[in-house]
């Protein structure tokens, strides 16, 4: 009997043979039979489709009929377009497969093609999504099996029994604790996107050689340091108009022999000591305007100030070097020559300060760069006797990083500007060390009453 032949009741003969439950028949068994028939017909249809796709005769017949009434040019264009579309769709269907998977690795739940390691198991996208939805929405209590929990789960039957599918997910080892709720999932996705964007920016910067500029947080730090410097820097940018030159006859007649071949002019020395106290006070005020410095213990603050005071005063004098008059302006008010500073008590230290001033004149530093140099000198963690060494080192690193990024922002046209500028920190540290040695000789050779109390307090050990 063919499928199209009819019975007396007008029904197909194959339909008549289909079992129909009586009132007392077990509905559960009938349901199982219908499910099996459904699966069988589904598999048969898939098999037929597969044979249909792979049959060379069918492909040839279909191709011939589709181009029978087309011009040769149309055939070429449409065949190329069809091939390209097929390749594109094929790529979409394949999707992304991680490199750690074997070529044809299967889902441990249903046997479909696996796409990755999901919730501690290698699964397909379908089982991953089913497991995630079940946990997120707490659906598993509502699942029930019609066949006593004995369903076989494969890629054909996986959608027919949720309870058995979920039980198999648990059995193979999928972890419920790894499923995130909506808020955590969104936060994780946001974090992943931010990290991707960050890596993208870093790669872009590397590719085009772009140097990072200050972040918002670093700009706040830079602003604080700059304001502290401007507020404590005597005369500011008007120092040239307000300076007064030390008379030429002062500092030219040495009257006290000092060690190391230097001379001390007591008149010049007395002039310098008059401006030294306000100069030291301004350095202390600069430090106290920095929140990081104020957070340190009092003992560490004193050690840092005593260590950097001469270095910062030398820097402030060096950036006010005037090549026309060949003078340095001390504390924003007194312009002195190299000889006057040397004979006034500093000896060879004056040469180092003048050489630094001549060198820095080509750097064209602004107030912010001078301020950041001072902050780096202040937060030197290698000063003897410090308690919070790691903390101070961290603070200096913050200043250095902000400083470097600010240099990038300024875009100086000096080759290797940043490393050259860092070398000036070394020069200033050397000046501080030389002055400490020179101070001992000055105490021996000069009358004690000429030394201001603050000068002695800062530079005496």
UniProtKB/Swiss-Prot annotation:
Bias category Basic and acidic residues: which stretches? 15-24
Where the record annotates domain NR LBD, the positions are 217-461
**InterPro entries according to UniProt:** NHR-like_dom_sf, Nucl_hrmn_rcpt_lig-bd, Nuclear_hormone_rcpt_NR1, Nuclear_hrmn_rcpt, ThyrH_rcpt, Znf_hrmn_rcpt, Znf_NHR/GATA
Binding of Zn(2+) 1, residues = 107, 110, 124, 127
Q: Which residues are listed for Zn(2+) 2 binding in this entry?
A: 145, 151, 161, 164
Zinc-finger ranges (NR C4-type): 107-127, 145-169
Q: Which residues bind L-thyroxine?
A: 282, 331, 435
Output the GO biological process annotations, alphabetical, semicolon-separated: animal organ morphogenesis; cellular response to thyroid hormone stimulus; female courtship behavior; mRNA transcription by RNA polymerase II; negative regulation of DNA-templated transcription; negative regulation of female receptivity; negative regulation of transcription by RNA polymerase II; positive regulation of thyroid hormone receptor signaling pathway
What residue ranges does this record give for the DNA-binding region? 107-181
Compartments annotated for it: namely: Nucleus
Tell me a GO cellular component.
Answer: nucleus
Where 3,3',5-triiodo-L-thyronine 1 binds, per the record, is at 435
Q: What Gene Ontology molecular-function terms does this entry list?
A: chromatin binding; chromatin DNA binding; DNA-binding transcription factor activity; enzyme binding; nuclear receptor activity; sequence-specific double-stranded DNA binding; thyroid hormone binding; transcription coactivator binding
Keywords from the UniProt entry: DNA-binding, Metal-binding, Nucleus, Receptor, Transcription, Transcription regulation, Zinc, Zinc-finger
Q: Where is this region: Modulating?
A: 1-106
Regarding protein family, the annotation reads: Belongs to the nuclear hormone receptor family. NR1 subfamily.
What is the role of this chain?
Nuclear hormone receptor that can act as a repressor or activator of transcription. High affinity receptor for thyroid hormones, including triiodothyronine and thyroxine.
Protein name stated in the entry: Thyroid hormone receptor beta
User: Lineage of this protein's species?
Assistant: Eukaryota, Metazoa, Chordata, Craniata, Vertebrata
The encoding gene is Thrb
